[in-house]
Curated annotation (Swiss-Prot):
It comes from the Bacteria. This is Xaa-Pro dipeptidase. Disulfide bonds: none annotated. The keyword Nucleotide-binding does not apply. The lineage of its organism: Bacteria, Pseudomonadati, Pseudomonadota, Gammaproteobacteria, Lysobacterales. Binds 2 manganese ions per subunit. HAMAP family: X_Pro_dipeptid.
Amino acid sequence: MPQPSLSSLYSDHLRTLTARADEALQRGGFEHLVVPSGSTHYQLFDDRDYPYAVNPQFKAWVPLTRVPNSWLVYTPGKRPTVIFYQPFDYWHVVPDAPSGWWVDHCDIHIIRTPEQALALLPKHAERCAILGEPQSTLGAYVPNNPQPVLDYLEYQRAFKTPYELALLRIAQQLAVRGHRAAEAAFRAGQSEFGIHMAYCAAVGQDANDLPYGNIIALNEHGAVLHYTELGQQPPQPLRSFLIDAGASAYGYASDITRTYAADPGSDFQALIDAVDAAQLRMGQNVRAGVDYKQLHIEAHLALMGILKEFGVLTVSPEAALATGVSAAFFPHGLGHLIGLQVHDVAGFAASDRGGRIERPAGHPYLRLTRVLEPGMVVTIEPGVYFIDMLLDEVKKNGHAASVNWQRVEAFKPYGGIRIEDEVVCTDGSAENLTRPVFASA
């Protein structure tokens, strides 16, 4: 069956966004939605700017990620207006004129200076819901970020349109290309820095383009959850490799993690295989009506069951969970929403009018507490780690007998394991966005 083009998907996406904006503006009592793309920020006491990061509320409407000082304006009943900043500048590369599948659906105005936007913005700033950072202020147009508007728009962002799913799939394909190159570099004995460079070259994106800093961790560095140091020399002997790395596609992110053992016959490889199989089952449980908090708790029990089988735990999974021992080995959340942002917004939202669904007691790092609904895209990223700081807490809290410390010492040089896919919640079975791409890569 022929796939719809991005142009037709974008047209439907825009209808969804305008309907959401209509409702959000009505709730907030505003007449216009105004979204600045953001501006460049300069380092303290220097003339060097930080890497530009586009306002997520802006790139939700148009696939533009490198256009500071631009604006999106929507008034109910009218086409969206894009005020596109294209300066006269011989110091830097100037953005190309707008083109692509989206341009026929918006009214586009080119400006040469930021101040020229003033003539194109709605006449009465006080009637505008302006979503942005304080530095985007232009004259009377000061970002006010009205809570009723944000609550509604951010809650609805959890439900991805077919257009958004298409871009998330592209981001998966790019990232998997990088993951394959990174694994090959690891097998060839490269350093963390060398593996990182192989990844970036394969994806065609550098640190300013990637949705987050690559985690390239060899051996015991895999026990640092967000390890980003990139060692210049490969450790000897080379035991393990944990990579958590994504890619960007027109403003949408992927977030994928894999773990590899240098020795395919090692106990660590067997542990990877067990976590991988459990992760796949967890992803299949992403279904409408399922409470993500419960998936997180079930992940703890599954992982502790694996550690029990491998002789790391001496107590039952239930006992490890009840005493907090499980959190020493699996100290983060099972996953999060993903889309325009890696950790997408409204993961705790009780409704589109605000409110908060709290995390379960004893699980302070879970980033998603909502009940799953069709259209949500979540990560499923269970992990098992051997972290000295957390294992010391197990001993201090009187639970040393729950752990076989000899087995812990055997696994510590490998750092840890994390496996992460993106999964779509549908009306039926879960759709894993990541596994099929690896299978065909």
